[in-house]
Amino acid sequence: MIVTRFAPSPTGYLHIGGLRTALYNYLYARANNGKFLLRIEDTDLKRNSEEATQAIKEAFAWCKLDHDGEVTYQSKRFDLYKEYVKKLLDEGKAYKCYMSKEELEELRASQEARKERPKYDNRYRDFTGTPPAGIEPVIRIKAPLSGEIVIHDGIKGEVKFKVEDILDDFIIARSDGTPTYNFTVVIDDALMGVTDVIRGDDHLSNTPKQIVLYEALGFKVPKFYHVAMINGEDGKKLSKRHGATDVMEYKKMGYLPEALLNFLVRLGWSHGDDEIFTIEDMLKYFNPNDINKSSSTYNAQKLDWLNSHYIKTLPYERLAHDMLEFGVDFKALVKGELLLNSLRERSKTLIEMANSANAIINAPKSYDEKAWAKFINENSKEILAKFAQILDRDLDAKGYEELTNKFLEQNGLKLKDLAQALRIALTGSSVSPSIFEVLEVVGSNEIKNRIQNLLKEEK
């Protein structure tokens, strides 16, 4: 059985790069009837944040990335890690190192002066004497002294590391007894039954150390897939300076989870020339072996395009529900479905839709200055006043279109002579959906009120 996991540290918000990693792991497990597990790597007790843990869970819930079983918290497993430290010490595969901080700094300085790679010099590897007083030891693994470590990566292919270039007897437990990152990861992945590890390629350098630990502990090494980073449009690693990176910020900005997941799955993976992928499509086609080796580029315009696609195509009930968070209750409006369906054709985000909806639902408190200067004058005011006089009952969009065409014909006018001024009267702006749909939503009495308000306006 395929078992994957997502293992964030709750020291900050969930980055969209992290969500992409979670998505890839989720898809691979679900497509193969496997398990997708969530582990919170909260061993850094000083930097952990309960808010960050909650944000991770909220992001998963929003994107509907359900995980199997209970969440695993590393902070609740310290006794377990200590057992495995003791096991390695008892088997002679790890040892206590009593080097002081000053000695380590002196060693590093001398190695750097000789232009050597800074690394531990193994002085306590086979130590049998009396340990120095007053020093709490760290625990180090006995790493191989020579040879190669080979990773058969599902994305990058065969990756070889020379032991002399990258390894030393690295620390697995600090002097206060807390375990190190690589040690806890290996134990948890093994005990949780993880078969496939899909993660960012910033973890590639950790992998040789983890393989050393898998072998020392007698655990089976999982299959690794190291995914290249997401870059900003300037070619540099994606960060806050490129815009929002917090997953829940995208929700606040009016993006749909379907659009964000579709966007992220394509940042590093493709299936032919297809651009639109529902979760069902992803489950059908996704394979981690097809992930690109090279970095992908964040494209804000592509995300907007995808979001507008899902706004156009998702069911009315779903969009109406999501719009409640943006202060618009379409279901409470007499013509709510008509209004939403009209606005969805021209909205890139739910915030845009909310702003457009509020401009139609509520009488304008002010008018766009450029639109006013361009379209409002004594002539257009006279046309609006005449138009208001013929509004004696509510109609549907087709009825308002017929009424308007008759009015224009009788007065020797064209639609452009009325439409923009009428839009400004109704919404405060010269931009709106179909003017006839706006008329239907607003209704004749309110249309007359808004025209009167504009006519009273002094500019």
UniProtKB/Swiss-Prot annotation:
ATP binds at residue 240. One of its GO terms (biological process) is glutamyl-tRNA aminoacylation. Disulfide bonds: none annotated. A motif ('KMSKS' region) lies at residues 237-241. A motif ('HIGH' region) lies at residues 8-18. It catalyses: tRNA(Glu) + L-glutamate + ATP = L-glutamyl-tRNA(Glu) + AMP + diphosphate. It is an enzyme of class 6 (ligase). Its main location: cytoplasm. It comes from the Bacteria. GO terms for cellular component: cytosol. Keywords: Aminoacyl-tRNA synthetase, ATP-binding, Cytoplasm, Ligase, Nucleotide-binding, Protein biosynthesis. GO terms for molecular function: ATP binding; glutamate-tRNA ligase activity; tRNA binding; zinc ion binding. The keyword DNA repair does not apply. Catalyzes the attachment of glutamate to tRNA(Glu) in a two-step reaction: glutamate is first activated by ATP to form Glu-AMP and then transferred to the acceptor end of tRNA(Glu). Belongs to the class-I aminoacyl-tRNA synthetase family. Glutamate--tRNA ligase type 1 subfamily. PANTHER family: GLUTAMATE--TRNA LIGASE, GLUTAMATE--TRNA LIGASE, MITOCHONDRIAL-RELATED. Monomer. This is Glutamate--tRNA ligase 2. It comes from Campylobacter concisus (strain 13826). The lineage of its organism: Bacteria, Pseudomonadati, Campylobacterota, Epsilonproteobacteria, Campylobacterales.
